[in-house]
Every structure is written in C-alpha cells, then in structure tokens.
A protein has these predicted regions:
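Anionic-ligand binding region
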Residues: 1
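C-terminal substrate-binding subdomain of Rossmann-fold SDR/epimerase-dehydratase oxidoreductases
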Residues: 5-132
Length: 132
C-alpha cells in the first residue's frame, strides 16, 4: 500500500473490512530476543498487534502520504484478529505501530532505498517465484 501511495498516488483496496493483525519486523525480532534473554517456556505465542481493517491501514497511509483510496468491490473473506495477551503477560513491550512503520517505509522510498518492483507487490513476487 505504501508503494502504491508513493508511486501512483492511489491505494487500491479490495473490500476493506477484513481485519489483519500487524507487527513491525523490529518488534518481531525483539520477540525472539525476549524469549532467548528471559528463557521463557516453549509453546505457542501470538505476536501481532493493532488488529486493523485493511481500510483503516489505507487511511493511516493516506494521512502520511497524500493519495486517493480506491475501494474495489471484491470480497475477501480472510479476516482474522489475534490476541497477543499471552506474549504481553511475559513482559514483552512492543515499540512500533502501523503509523510509525508507514513513516519508516515512506522515508525509505523518498531516500531511494526502496524501489517499486515486484518485491513490493506480494502477488507479483509470488508468481515470479512460482509460489501458489
């Protein structure tokens, strides 16, 4: 979405009401560090925060990068929330949110550190790498 906003001044949203949990890559790395440093018990832990709709994410981007949001009438039934309560109860504290991640990605586009290519588009990248 950030690539679309930066390069095309428009974000194309399919549906928009689907919910997705979000986590910054640095927070994900910090989850692993947290487990290693604190020698926490093994088992399943969810690591995702800010359960936001796709449209909410697009609007966060629009506040940072002036662009239009085009909503396509395509139904995507994949929608899920997750709770990271178990992880948070171990003392883990997230440092980043979607807005700060968008700012970071946008800054890297401005600096030329990120280019608009297939790696910015999940479906194109998956097709190119024969992933179904």
């Amino acid at each position: 979405f950030v690539s679309q906003a930066f390069n095309h001044k428009q974000i194309s949203v399919n549906g928009g009401n689907q919910i997705r949990p979000n986590i910054h890559i640095d927070d994900l790395v910090n989850v692993y560090r947290h487990f290693i440093i604190n020698n926490l018990p093994a088992g399943p832990y969810n690591a995702g925060f800010e359960n936001l709709s796709i449209l909410e994410i697009a609007n966060i981007i629009k506040k940072i990068i002036p662009c239009e949001i085009k909503i396509n009438n395509i139904t995507d039934i994949r929608s899920y929330r997750l709770s990271s309560k178990k992880l948070l109860e171990t003392g883990f504290v997230k440092k980043y949110n979607v807005s700060s991640a968008v700012q970071e990605i946008y800054s890297n586009f401005i600096k030329g550190h990120i280019q608009d290519n297939d790696s910015c588009h999940t479906v194109l990248w998956m097709k190119k790498n024969s992933i179904k």
